[in-house]
Amino acid sequence: LEDMELMTWAIFQSGQKIPAKIYSKILAQWDQYSHQMANFHETYDILLTPTVADVAPKHGQFALSENLQNQLKHMADFDWPKQQELIWEMFADSLDWTPFTQQANLTGQPSISLPVYRDEQGLSLGVQLTAAKGREDLLLHLTQQMEECSVFS
């Protein structure tokens, strides 16, 4: 635990106890999501979404409670269902704020987040561009075009 961030360590511990049947099912679901996105990209070059659902959060807004941190430190002592409950609790508050970014993490697609607007307080709002697997070149080319048009704020 000294050489690993607490949330990463907790996820690692949960992975040690995941039943093989469930692990296989999860991998199959990830493959299905990847296939669906590959089909999407046969028609569309880019998926455009907001990066997040709002402006930047306040510092510490999604900080883990002391109680949750203590439970995570003892993650190895819990059975797998309890571990899953704690992992969900780790992310639950922030998922409403970042509903769009997980997809690329699950499917392995290249994505880029770009600041395209500033609100009245100067906080950036961004868009996320997601391309098909292996099409990082498309993201870089589009980003260059946007930069040349002074789109970034």
Please tell me what each predicted stretch does.
Residues 1-38, 54-83, 115-116, 120-123:
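Short helix-loop capping/hinge segments that flank enzyme active sites or metal/cofactor-binding pockets
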Residues 72-102:
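Aromatic-anchored helix/helix-loop segment that forms the rim or "lid"
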